[in-house]
A protein has these predicted regions:
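Extracellular glycan-modifying ectodomains
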Residues: 1-345
Length: 345
């Protein structure tokens, strides 16, 4: 028996040490990796994130709210509804465009995050709050609705004007017992690493760029979500009409409530850098340009991040978007907030 256990240990011990070593490695790099690196399990090194974070604002200047019934009880200069670009995506809340918006405008800024954001899209949430009387000119002067490009078409096509109440999570024994979502443990990330790398299921794509656009160890390499080249293409006439109808419904609802509406389109990382990809094998993405054409009569309500940030990339400014993340950098957040401030009332 003893001999058998010794023989088995020669096989099991190296595997066990491999898993433990990889778990320790992934635990060590977790805090200095962006969302792309955590998904793709590619380390960008602590120096890169440290250099980006050295330019953050010293604190968070905006407030968060997840209960729509409380919006009526307070007033704010700017209410923001959005996705991860408005909720700490990138390097956290201190680097959000919303934080720069609050700091540099001198307005009270509130970010509304529904208790279950998966129930609705930013435009749907905005319409429901306006249409159901949760907000108007007496408690909200300006409303910023931010949407990331890759989900825009699907979200708009699922838009409805028929909600009679704000969608909420159905309380069941399972939801009541559910614990808050946490970051994957190192061991779970080992499982993901093996699955992605052995079976080719890595959700992160890699492309060679014609010139450096990032700082760090791979300045001319682009990592981006595979969804960036799967969603937002070949918009059918029916989908185009649904997109326009969604925008017009929200614009009309804001106008009726006396709220100044600002629409922010957060460009996909692939879209803004697609022209720099060497021998680009992926299709051209034109949704930003299409939206500008379709919504020409209301263009003054829009802030297109691609239009704001592309000139800086052309001028050679690095890290307009983060190398290790799908979001733009804190420096770009400041540029975006400046454009929004120009449209505030």
């Amino acid at each position: 028996m003893r001999k058998f256990l010794i023989n088995i240990s020669y096989t099991v011990l190296p595997v066990w040490l491999f898993f433990v070593g990889m778990a320790v490695y992934l635990w060590a790099i977790d805090d200095n990796s962006g969302d792309l690196m955590r998904l793709g399990l590619i380390d960008s090194g602590p120096e890169y994130t440290d250099s980006i974070c050295s330019h953050l604002l010293p604190e968070v200047y905006y407030t968060g709210q997840d209960d729509d019934s409380l919006l009526r009880l307070d007033t704010c200069g700017v209410l923001v509804i959005g996705d991860s670009f408005s909720h700490g995506g990138g390097v956290g809340k201190q680097g959000d465009y919303v934080n720069y918006l609050a700091h540099e405008s001198g307005r009270k800024v509130v970010v509304f995050t529904p208790q279950d954001p998966s129930l609705s899209s930013p435009m749907q949430i905005a319409f429901d709050l306006l249409n159901l009387g949760r907000i108007d000119s007496t408690n909200v002067k300006n409303l910023v609705v931010e949407e990331v490009e890759r989900y825009l078409v699907d979200r708009h096509c699922g838009f409805t004007t028929k909600h009679t109440s704000i969608p909420r999570v159905e309380k069941t024994e399972e939801t009541q017992a559910a614990t808050p979502e946490k970051s994957p443990s190192p061991l779970l990330r080992v499982k993901d690493f093996l699955f992605y790398h052995l079976f080719g299921a890595n959700p992160i794509l890699k492309a060679q760029l014609s010139r450096p656009v990032f700082g760090g160890v791979q300045p001319d390499v682009l990592y981006f979500y595979n969804e960036d080249v799967k969603m937002g293409f070949d918009v059918s006439p029916k989908s185009r009409q649904l997109i326009l109808d969604c925008y017009r419904q929200v614009i009309d609802a804001a106008r009726q409530r006396g709220v100044n509406l600002i629409l922010l389109v957060a460009c996909d990382k692939y879209d803004i850098l697609q022209d720099y990809i060497v021998d680009n094998p992926y299709p051209a993405k034109t949704l930003n340009e299409d939206l500008m054409q379709w919504m020409a009569p209301d263009l003054d309500r829009f802030v297109f991040s691609k239009q704001v940030l592309s000139p800086y990339i052309e001028q050679g400014v690095k890290d307009v978007y983060l190398f290790n993340d799908t979001h733009w950098s804190p420096a770009s957040s400041q540029l975006i907030s400046a454009e929004i401030i120009k449209k505030l009332q």
